[in-house]
Amino acid sequence: MEALAKEIGIPEGEYREIVQRLGREPNRVELLLFKVMWSEHCAYKNSRPLLKALPKEGEAVLQGPGENAGVVRVGEGWAVAFKIESHNHPSAVEPFQGAATGVGGILRDIMSMGARPIALLDSLRFGPPEEARSRYLLKGVVSGIAFYGNAIGVPTVGGDLYFHEGYRENPLVNAMCLGLLREEHLKRSRASLGRPIYYAGAKTGRDGIGGAAFASRELKEEKAEDRPAVQVGDPFLGKLLMEATLEAIELDLVEGVQDMGAAGLTSSLSELAHKSGLGVELHLDLVPTREEGMTPEELLLSESQERMVLVPKEGKEKALEEVFGRWGLDCVPVARTIPERVFRVLFRGEVVAEVPTEALAEAPTYVRVGREDPEVRRLRETPIPPLEADPQEVLRRLLASPNLASREAVYERYDHQVGTRTALLPGKGDAAVLWIKGTRLGVAAKVDQNPRYSRLHPRLGAMHALAEACRNVSVVGAKPLAYTDGLNLGSPETPEGYHELAETIAGLKEASEALGVPVVSGNVSLYNESGGKRIPPTAMVGVVGVLEVDKRAEMGFRRPGEVLLLIGEERGELGASEVLYLLTGKEFGHPPRLDLGREKAVQEAIRDLIQRGLTRTAHDVAEGGLLLALAEMTFPYGVGATVEVREEGLEALFGEAPSRVLFTVEKTRLQEATLLLEERGLPYRVLGETGGKSLTVLTPGGVLEWSLEELLSAWKAPLREVLDG
């Protein structure tokens, strides 16, 4: 078996650990179980020790990390389950199916908590859009997300899209889902002793075998051999499974639910047993199959989609079978919990594997020594040279640049209103807002991350990601409750890669503590590199908040004659900025500094302004700086503005800095708004007034003016050309 262990990529030290835990040599089936359960994708061997440091508790938290999704209270007996998941490696090989099954998987995570999925957000990263491969991947991924989400009837209400050369070979596809549930319907992956465990949903085939292990290694140039590791999704079957599962939960028929995702039956059953402090006996001959002659290994490791395991309450077995029968789905007992804490597998009457559940679930962990990449330090410490450029032209070029142009060409492919809960449409606000029907409550959600910041300063980049996601949720009027993190990085086995992982998590910890927003779920995807080139450390942070749905703010200027104010400093920084890259073609300099105390105060202030009815228009100043944000505010309703910028230079017009928010207020209430800001000791400036069909900016160097038509034209075309070309 040692030779086989080496052949399938189990390190020598881990093989010895397996032998020690079993007290004997494993057989072939057992060795393959350890291969997938001890993969980085399932076991988090390198990240688990670091993730322990993240704050996980908060007054709204019902369920933190460790289950299929996190859950927070939002009021009136309602709760929201949410999580972000990656499907990076499959999407690099088969972008359509990789993205589609990524959506399917995260939907099942949410419904396994007893929640009805109500919204999807996607966070996507690709190489330069002028390259054919990037365009191919983008089109396939967007189509896959639309295919699954639209067909299953869950709206895609927001997301985050970035192009960067660091993702040329390794695209990132992260999907976030929110689900709504009554607090009393919350389910967990648990079972009591002697209970049957039911297999429900699609029949098992050979698709996706080895997917967990595939997601735990570096991508190679030749990808044809990886195609069998990519699963195939069926959203129509997924819809039936969702309705049947939620009906069973609502009828109080089940005590435990578990999605069947990475590592298939092996992971779902062994984890359920381990969390319950029990063992499980699985009879593979009872598993519904769609292919002939499947071996024990194939049945155990298949990652066929649209499958769940459920544990019925005593006496509810027949009722459970009837519910799934009405939806035309298989629902059969395949296993039973046992007192011995082992994962026992039988095939044709023989035991083919018997492994302690703890041995499978508790993989070895690694704490390594990290070292900053000297090239990253050199780039960060490179001084910014004097930059000369015509601001008139710079704004047009920024609006047309891949990372700042309109995302309408993407989100118009998604159904973002199915379910009739969407209270703030894509492009209308800084975060998505969904209404909880029958209440006054709304739920806001946003995903954020800036690869330039993270590449040059992993810790600060992660802090910015959480701060901006919280800021965007606050700017629509919602109080951030908790976050989910999708950590996407290269190999942790190099000192530089491990340094980036450790620093990213340290940054999240610092921002989480300062902002009072805990983590409740997440995902770690490592080995995102090719040919030794790592992706930028990418912490996709998804924040969920709660608000009174009628007191929400949009980003667009709604009417002329309102006063426009800026909270925060007028001047930004050029390091790691979009304008610096636009003018030099290079990425360097120190990312903007972040004062987390100031950040929290700014977020509280804008929420108060919205809740008091002082403003209904607010927008954060982020990538592209002040003028870019002002231009974005003119687009939704075609209302312009005239403003004065007192500071000189590109830093004032296009520099980037956190803790800045633009908002409007009626002239009669200006004093109320400014008094609120003064009481909190926050810097602010009255910039000007809304109105007209142009954006006019008075600067120390003269007057700048753009027609709204020219700005809108520059902003709308680029991404459409990429997707339609």
UniProtKB/Swiss-Prot annotation:
InterPro entries: PRibForGlyAmidine_synth_PurL, PurL_linker, PurM-like_C_dom, PurM-like_C_sf, PurM-like_N, PurM-like_N_sf. ATP binds at residues 66-67, 83-85, 109, 485, 522-523. Substrate binds at residues 86-89, 108, 211, 231, 303-305, 525. Its EC number is 6.3.5.3. One of its GO terms (biological process) is 'de novo' IMP biosynthetic process. The keyword Protein biosynthesis does not apply. The active site is at residues 41, 87. Monomer. Part of the FGAM synthase complex composed of 1 PurL, 1 PurQ and 2 PurS subunits. Part of the phosphoribosylformylglycinamidine synthase complex involved in the purines biosynthetic pathway. Catalyzes the ATP-dependent conversion of formylglycinamide ribonucleotide (FGAR) and glutamine to yield formylglycinamidine ribonucleotide (FGAM) and glutamate. The FGAM synthase complex is composed of three subunits. PurQ produces an ammonia molecule by converting glutamine to glutamate. PurL transfers the ammonia molecule to FGAR to form FGAM in an ATP-dependent manner. Belongs to the FGAMS family. This is Phosphoribosylformylglycinamidine synthase subunit PurL. The gene is purL.
